[in-house]
């Protein structure tokens, strides 16, 4: 009888270990006045492609609220090969792919939600296809993930829902890391939407530790990264207003974000948390046209000269640029975008 009971307990423990993720050891960046090893790698990458693609692509909207049915996402194809090939030929060293935007629609088959590609008009696992292509073509991959989720956590004022939603997020981050790293390393996590709650309500420490435990090379950044000395959670502190020693709004993190702004000149690099100083480069995000997501009426394009000027300013001072190039409803980058990137690479002599 005791043996049978012990066996039942062992089975239960095995079930728990299989169906939950172990809590990682808490880790933090090392205080430093200079860039660390992986920050140097990030600075060396210098230039990448930002890819906004998802359910918003099919509604001519930048932000939707989670009410659009998954079936309305229906690209005729997913030409991940073209996306990666275009980035590589443009002299870009990596891609940042939007995996889930504010509405909560996931570009992979997630076991945590039905609001994903598996229940849509095209069931291709976009995240995995891009990961495979990045590996095949020799370009690095980072992932964008919105903390704010208007499907799973629409009522952000209800603090009682934080614990369940934080578990949901951590589960999805584990899911993404495990899936992508079967094919290629993840070099960056780009988090967004933190302004919808006070910074202390987000599980930044757990997210950072989870990522670093499985992907130590991965750099973690949260949009609108810096606060004010008298209000560390102030939103937003523009680049020109950031001063050396200002508090890190979302700690731990490794680099600064504040889209769509470019860094100040001179650009401060040293910021603080609990009396310690950390080096943090700036990553700029710039749209090649007028929108983040593809819109049928988006006909405003920057010129090659404009883009060249933005590139020079954004990548000076050991900073980084990702240029947003959104695929259309056929799952391809627009011909005009491809030509602009090609012409820009020639002008800047990028390889």
What are these regions (language model features)?
Residues 1-24:
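Bacterial Sec-dependent N-terminal signal peptides
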Residues 23-351:
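Mature catalytic domains of secreted/periplasmic carbohydrate-active enzymes
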């Amino acid at each position: 009888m005791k043996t049978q009971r012990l066996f039942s307990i062992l089975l239960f423990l095995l079930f728990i270990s299989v169906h939950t993720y172990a809590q990682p050891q808490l880790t933090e960046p090392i205080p430093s006045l200079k860039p660390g090893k992986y920050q140097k790698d990030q600075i060396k990458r210098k230039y990448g492609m930002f890819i906004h693609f998802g359910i918003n692509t099919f509604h001519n909207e930048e932000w939707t609220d989670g009410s659009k049915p998954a079936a309305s996402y229906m690209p005729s194809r997913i030409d991940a090969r073209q996306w990666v090939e275009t980035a590589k030929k443009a002299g870009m060293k990596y891609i940042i792919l939007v995996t889930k935007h504010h509405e909560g629609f996931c570009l992979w088959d997630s076991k945590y939600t039905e609001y994903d590609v598996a229940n849509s008009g095209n069931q291709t696992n976009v995240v995995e296809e891009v990961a495979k292509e990045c590996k095949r073509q020799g370009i690095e991959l980072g992932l964008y993930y919105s903390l704010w989720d208007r499907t799973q956590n629409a009522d952000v004022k209800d603090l009682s829902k934080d614990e369940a939603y934080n578990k949901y997020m951590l589960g999805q981050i584990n899911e993404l890391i495990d899936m992508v790293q079967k094919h290629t390393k993840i070099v960056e996590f780009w988090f967004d939407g933190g302004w919808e709650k006070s910074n202390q309500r987000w599980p930044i420490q757990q997210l950072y530790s989870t990522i670093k435990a499985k992907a130590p090379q991965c750099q973690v950044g949260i949009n609108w990264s810096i606060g004010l000395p008298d209000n560390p959670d102030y939103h937003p502190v523009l680049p020109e207003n950031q001063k050396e020693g200002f508090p890190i709004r979302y700690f731990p993190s490794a680099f600064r974000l504040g889209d769509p702004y470019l860094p100040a000149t001179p650009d401060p690099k040293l910021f603080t948390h609990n009396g310690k100083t950390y080096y943090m480069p700036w990553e700029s995000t710039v749209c090649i046209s007028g929108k983040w997501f593809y819109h049928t009426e988006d006909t405003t394009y920057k010129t090659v000269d404009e883009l060249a000027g933005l590139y020079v300013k954004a990548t000076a001072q050991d900073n980084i640029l990702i240029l947003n190039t959104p695929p259309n409803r056929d799952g391809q980058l627009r011909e005009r975008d491809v030509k602009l990137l090609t012409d820009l690479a020639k002008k800047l002599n990028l390889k």
